[in-house]
């Protein structure tokens, strides 16, 4: 039997070598052997060491000993501003890799580690100080962390402050620099039970020193999310505040908030705006609501489901109280949802149902002037428009009444509509023809006109359409392609295709993104996929699944109240009107979205 050939190379490594080497160096230091430099700390105390160890442990010493300065050759180096006990700890760490951080040494050790460039020790001190955060030191700790570029500690301090802002003393908050206060007010994580508390925080800061701070009031008010301040408070306190009444920029912000609450502000048509995003602590969230549709067996659904993108969870809302039928249209007006028309196959409906999100209830409102199916509905300037081939009418929710308008100049079958830049657009094929056109309604003139928008994309039939950030998006029913029209520039464009087709699916805008759900996919299987398009990244991603595969459903987005995310306990400061809305020690009922409107 042949013996195996001897190995030419035997790879070997000793896992304990690094630790053994450290121990050896530490022993040489203790025996004062081969020492080639002495560090002199503040107060004149000497620390003998090895240059190679210091240079390997710290970029500061590496640069010092490798450069052309006098210290590179000196046997004695004086370190200004480094306490001897802190230098002792850092030298011990260089030879052992260990250091004991405590409440007595954490801050001075961090300063020394920052100066002498021991990043691991600096990070350990920051982690220790994070555990020491409390109401008495959080503001100073954030100052300290930012002064020494401790990102982790600075971030932890800010999170602590935002979460406990209602428990901080008034004097602490009033001493904040402007930039810091603006940062807190603009942060989604500012933990207030109601937006009125954020407004009061800004107002109290200005009132603490009016001569110096009044000029900053418009900037502060812009950082408050006035649209989510309750209407009675907006009228009784914000509008009556002299700082607001005498300031045109503040009055514009107030008007914006009132338009939003009266459903006259289309947040989807405008560009992204933080003021239109409620803080999670208030319990309000923008949600996707699905109404009706058909299931796998083509059975009609009367369920109403809502999806909260913050939690990724679905919840049931009040079921539709009647037979939905087919051919109905769904639209959101403010925080309410309207379902118009439809048919049961033999009879057209003129009925209109309103979902009141504040009480989770469906009620019937004034019927349309004409019964219809396969029409389209959109909201423009706080009014609900219903558009069909031969007629157009408009609903005013403040008077619960309908008004007949001029019909389209060129009747279109089964059109899609969307409001954009103050006008209503309709897209579809001319009645009895295959020619696709786009028409525009001018509300100030009660007039329809044909839009000369060049060659339309090759749609087989009217695509689903929504408006986002001043652009009109068109989702094809038989393709994953997505077209975009800019009415201001009169230009067409494409965005990346969806991950799949959604034949019979639904389209909505939520949180500055397009949401497409359900329908039949590329394999003709009924899908439960919900995918979203983010204009900032120009990418589609699957964000969830429907409760069950569904098609021919409607979807819209509204704001709805969920459980507030404010921490319990602690004191706060009183709001105008005598109620301590920052005092979260007592449970409170959730905010009613109807109060906004």
Swiss-Prot record:
Primary place of residence?
cytoplasm
Q: Where is the composition biased (Pro residues)?
A: 587-597
Q: Which GO terms describe its cellular component?
A: Cul3-RING ubiquitin ligase complex; cytoplasm; polar microtubule
Positions of the UniProt region annotated as Disordered? 570-597
Q: What biological-process terms (Gene Ontology) are attached? A: cell division; chromosome passenger complex localization to spindle midzone; proteasome-mediated ubiquitin-dependent protein catabolic process; protein ubiquitination; regulation of cytokinesis
What is the annotated role of this protein in its UniProt record? Substrate-specific adapter of a BCR (BTB-CUL3-RBX1) E3 ubiquitin-protein ligase complex required for efficient chromosome alignment and cytokinesis. The BCR(KLHL21) E3 ubiquitin ligase complex regulates localization of the chromosomal passenger complex (CPC) from chromosomes to the spindle midzone in anaphase and mediates the ubiquitination of AURKB. Ubiquitination of AURKB by BCR(KLHL21) E3 ubiquitin ligase complex may not lead to its degradation by the proteasome.
Name used for this protein in its record: Kelch-like protein 21
Give the originating organism.
Bos taurus (Bovine)
Q: What is the lineage of its organism?
A: Eukaryota, Metazoa, Chordata, Craniata, Vertebrata
């Amino acid at each position: 039997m042949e013996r195996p050939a001897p190995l030419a190379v035997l790879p070997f490594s000793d896992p304990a070598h690094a630790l053994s080497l450290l121990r050896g160096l530490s022993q040489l230091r203790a025996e004062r052997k081969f020492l080639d430099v002495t560090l002199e700390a503040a107060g004149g105390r000497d620390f003998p060491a090895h240059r190679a160890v210091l240079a390997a442990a710290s970029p500061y010493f590496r640069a010092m000993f490798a450069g052309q300065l006098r210290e590179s050759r000196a046997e004695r180096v004086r370190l200004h501003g480094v306490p001897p006990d802190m230098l002792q700890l850092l030298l011990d760490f260089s030879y052992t890799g260990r250091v004991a951080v405590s409440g007595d040494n954490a801050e001075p050790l961090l300063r020394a580690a920052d100066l002498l460039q021991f990043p691991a020790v600096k990070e350990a001190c920051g982690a220790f100080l994070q555990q020491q955060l409390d109401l008495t030191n959080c503001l100073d700790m954030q100052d300290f962390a930012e002064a020494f570029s401790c990102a982790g500690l600075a971030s932890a301090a800010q999170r602590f402050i935002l979460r406990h802002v209602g428990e901080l003393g008034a004097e602490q908050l009033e001493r904040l620099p402007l930039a810091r206060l603006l940062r807190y007010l603009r942060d989604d994580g500012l933990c207030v039970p109601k937006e009125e508390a954020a407004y009061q925080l800004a107002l109290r800061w200005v009132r603490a020193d009016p001569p110096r701070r009044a000029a900053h009031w418009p900037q502060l008010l812009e950082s408050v999310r006035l649209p989510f301040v309750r209407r009675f408070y907006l009228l009784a306190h914000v509008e009556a505040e002299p700082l607001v009444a005498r300031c045109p920029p503040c009055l514009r912000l107030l008007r914006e908030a009132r338009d939003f609450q009266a459903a006259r502000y289309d947040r989807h048509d405008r560009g992204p705006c933080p003021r239109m995003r409620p803080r999670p602590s208030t319990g309000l969230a923008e949600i996707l609501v699905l109404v009706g549709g058909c299931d796998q067996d083509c059975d009609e659904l009367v369920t109403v489901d809502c999806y909260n993108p913050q939690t990724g969870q679905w919840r049931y809302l009040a079921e539709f109280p009647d037979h939905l039928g087919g051919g109905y249209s769904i639209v959101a007006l403010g925080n309410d949802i309207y379902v118009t028309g439809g048919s049961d196959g033999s009879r057209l409906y003129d009925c209109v149902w309103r979902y009141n999100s504040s009480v989770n209830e469906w009620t019937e409102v004034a019927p349309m002037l004409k019964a219809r199916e396969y029409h389209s509905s959109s909201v423009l300037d706080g009014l609900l428009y219903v558009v069909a081939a031969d007629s157009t009418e408009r609903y005013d929710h403040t008077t619960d009444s309908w008004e007949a308008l001029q019909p389209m100049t060129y009747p279109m079958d089964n059109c899609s509509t969307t409001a954009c830049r103050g006008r209503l657009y309709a897209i579809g094929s001319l009645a009895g023809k295959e020619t696709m056109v786009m028409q525009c309604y001018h509300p100030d003139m009660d007039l329809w006109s044909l839009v000369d928008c060049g060659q339309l994309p090759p749609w087989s039939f009217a695509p689903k359409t929504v408006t986002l950030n001043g652009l009109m998006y068109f989702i094809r029913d038989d393709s994953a392609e997505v077209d975009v029209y800019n009415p201001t520039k009169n230009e067409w464009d494409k965005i990346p295709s969806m991950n799949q087709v959604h034949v019979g699916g639904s389209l909505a805008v939520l949180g500055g993104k397009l949401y497409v759900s359900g329908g039949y996919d590329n394999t003709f299987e009924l899908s439960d996929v919900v995918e979203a398009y983010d204009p900032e990244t120009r990418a589609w991603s699957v964000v969830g699944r429907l409760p069950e595969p569904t098609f021919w459903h409607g979807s819209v987005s509204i704001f709805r109240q969920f459980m507030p995310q404010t921490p319990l306990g602690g004191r706060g400061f009183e709001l105008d009107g005598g109620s301590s809305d920052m005092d979260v020690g007592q449970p409170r009922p959730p905010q009613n979205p109807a109060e906004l409107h």
